Amino acid sequence: MTANAELLQGSLFGDLEPQANAESCSETIARALRNDLSDQELVDESLKRPRNRHNPTSVPSIPLDSESQEQLETADNDNDLPAWAHHNLVDPEQLTPMLRHYVELKAKHPERILLYRLGDFFECFFEDAIQLSRLLELTLTGKEGGKGIGRVPMAGVPHHAAERYCAELIRHGLSVAICDQLETTASKGALLKRDITRVLTPGTVLAEGMLTARRNNWLAAVVVEPAQGNQPFCWGLANADVSTGEFLITQREGSAELHQHLAQLEASELIMAQKIGESSRPEWCPEQLFLTTMATTPFSQPEAERTLLNHYRLSTLDGLGLQEVPLALRAAGGLLTYLRDTQPLAENVDEGIAPMPLEHPLTVFAGDALVLDAQTRRNLELTSTQRDGQFQGSLLWAVDRTLTAMGARCLRRWIEAPLLDSKAIRARQAVVNHLVETRSLRHSLRRFLRPMGDLERLAGRAGAGHAGARELVAIADGIERLPRLAEQLHNALSSAPHWLDNLLTLDKSLPKLAASIREQLINNPPLSLSEGGLMHDNVDPLLDGLRNQLDDQDTWLAGQEIQERKLSGNPNLRLQYHRTFGYFLAVSKAKASMVPDHWIRRQTLANEERFITPDLKTREGQIFQLRARACQREYELFCQLREQVGKQATSIRKAARAVAGLDALVGLAEVAATGDYCCPEIDDSRELQLKTCRHPVVEQLLVERSFIANDVELGKDIDLVVLTGPNASGKSCYLRQIGLIQLLAQVGSWVPAKQARVGIADRIFTRVGAVDDLAAGQSTFMVEMAETANILHHASDRSLVLLDEIGRGTATFDGLSIAWAVSEHLATDLRSRTVFATHYHELNGLSQELTNVANFQVLVEETGDDLVFLHQVAAGGANRSYGIEAARLAGVPNDVVQRARQVLAQLQDDGSSLPALPSAKTINRPS
């Protein structure tokens, strides 16, 4: 590939190397005049003049002028909106060749913003330009479209800032097609070769600036089979994080469970086959999901099998174990097809590397993890707060002490899918226990982890051919830390979870890979891959030969500056370089009239004149050609190195996953050691015994007072606790802390308590508060009843059920009757471990009829008219809710509070009769 002047900006010039046998200046200049040396001549020449290893620089040795960093505009401003607002309005035959090519590409991607590379900018035209200018607040300008057409809308962004602008478009729910230049010099009279190199969608982005570092970016695909006769609604789901290589599939039944699973996954994008007559957004699809539809063919069984076989280069799918999940297999095939259609051209990718390296799909079964429906996740505020969706105030915020992005993602996955296997839980506990007890080891590991890069995503970018030089250096740095981490663990842990083996028995090829990166790349390479300055000297003889030639040219330039100073009699003359205008001789305005006759004026500025000479102009072309060859050779060497790293992406990721898990465990140990936590005793019983337990989030948010700890006992003799007490006394907080401690224990963490015994739960259900669902046409009461029905249909004797009021949104006796019946069913038929907070004090009577029901209350202290909340849970049922006192504390006007007391007294005296309006009370009507 030939490079043009655009590729040549920057320089490989460095300080001249001292030579053992110094040559005369004339000999150096004579050699530099030869710019047509063959590759073999350059290699031979590099052996005669070996280079001392140093970090090459991409900055020209000739000083840059003050304007050299400015971006050149590629179009004139036009304040009038151009007439052609859509590409379909234009006859392509009338367009210029470039715009005709743009329209051809746009026709293939009508639903995407098309960014078309023109020089230093990515440009949009027609409707895309109008949309781009509005969304990103860019100037809408125009470009000549051809004879009889005039100017068409145009807007663009600098190529070096394209990632930032694309990220903003993705956040607006758009996808972007990138058309890049595939060559740097076109044939005479022809356009530069350009094509779509990648398509950016919410689920397929790889660039660091478009991803959230501490959470997965899931792309999901779904295949559904509606219920027919006795056949239930079935679905298969595949979800992949293309940045980390994770690929999971599952197959289950029920549209409600699909909705719940998608809500829990929080995928960035969902792909599905669009069938004729079907709704564009089915009822089971959460409203906030970015939905992409495809043709049905990629989701067919034969096509999906073919796609999987080709992607993983297999002869059979038997080893993947997909026979029992045919719908999930079809979803996986559709997902891989979508990735193939949206990823870059595999120009420099060896046949053995997939353009988008994903691990073999891992089947996730329904019983693999603790089930948390969307309502429970929201009520327990696992990853964001219920009120405003903020991270601070969530459980993850309270326990996340990870030091790496991959560790944070790992901990998030653990919290979203706690374990059911007691053996796996104890394996995590064992590491946490040792790290809590061994403070020096914990702190040492944290020191090693703190500077660790995101190896998981870095390996993915390298495998996909997207990584830059700095990212390869970061990979080398991370790999070099792995043996030291492993050594720390070998000396400390007698037993460890099996997944840590990928760190403890490190792939021996990885240290060699890191050494290869260090040998070739400088420590702080430039961001650009096309301007040189990436590789060390002595990496490649051809590159060394080119650099020697460039050093000779540098010597000539330095000598030319001295020579022209003498000829002009101007000691202040400077030979400089401009990215646009090339090399020139700069003199002040006062000296401009005294320059030699052979100088040619190149540019006039306010304070100086710029000139060239015939020799300088000739030499400039030679320098550009040499620099282009050197830059191209460096890029070729870099691509070879990146390919070498990409082939090891799987090994790097395995080690990275082990580091991520270790980071999560070290963080949990830090929380436990500094937060007065205890190690829970985990077993397969139904018991939940907590001594002086606390809410892990609320205790960190309290500043002026201490958290009041309480006990919990469920599952041994008591299955259901009826919890009564005043409004705002802490009943909801008590319910949530029970659920969070159960969850933390099954993650493998210590818990905020003095002592804990936790029997493994299969599901956690919560019903805490309700609001109208106006979009679905449901009142608060109907929402509450739907949530209650879900619990009663799916809870088992191993479930933990946390209820905060049932039956409030209807008549008192109706609500009480429902609450009583639900409590009876939970205690007798399901025997779920349940805590039911209520203001129906009549429910205290259940304990007299059922031996597995107990009454508890949240204590308050009355001092005159004042009410002090003690936040202490004690045995026995309350007989008052103190609602009026709570209203007064909330700031309800005093006259309303006093009237409420009168009404309450009257109701208590007269039973259920309606209180009369006091005779002294008058009604003020508006005039």
Curated annotation (Swiss-Prot):
Keyword set, alphabetical order: ATP-binding, DNA damage, DNA repair, DNA-binding, Nucleotide-binding
GO molecular function, one term: ATP-dependent DNA damage sensor activity
GO biological process, one term: mismatch repair
Protein's recorded name: DNA mismatch repair protein MutS
Region (Disordered): 44-80
Protein's UniProt keywords contain Cytoplasm: no
Gene that produces this protein: mutS
CDD domains attached to this UniProt entry: ABC_MutS1
GO cellular component, as recorded: cytosol
Pfam family, one: MutS_V
Organism: Prochlorococcus marinus (strain MIT 9313)
Family to which this protein belongs: Belongs to the DNA mismatch repair MutS family.
UniProt-annotated binding residues for ATP: G725, P726, N727, A728, S729, G730, K731, S732
Biased composition range(s): Acidic residues: 67-79
Its job: This protein is involved in the repair of mismatches in DNA. It is possible that it carries out the mismatch recognition step. This protein has a weak ATPase activity.
Gene3D superfamilies: 1.10.1420.10, DNA repair protein MutS, domain I (3.40.1170.10), MutS, connector domain (3.30.420.110), P-loop containing nucleotide triphosphate hydrolases (3.40.50.300)
InterPro entries linked: DNA_mismatch_repair_MutS, DNA_mismatch_repair_MutS-lik_N, DNA_mismatch_repair_MutS/MSH, DNA_mismatch_repair_MutS_C, DNA_mismatch_repair_MutS_clamp, DNA_mismatch_repair_MutS_core, DNA_mismatch_repair_MutS_N, DNA_mismatch_repair_MutS_sf
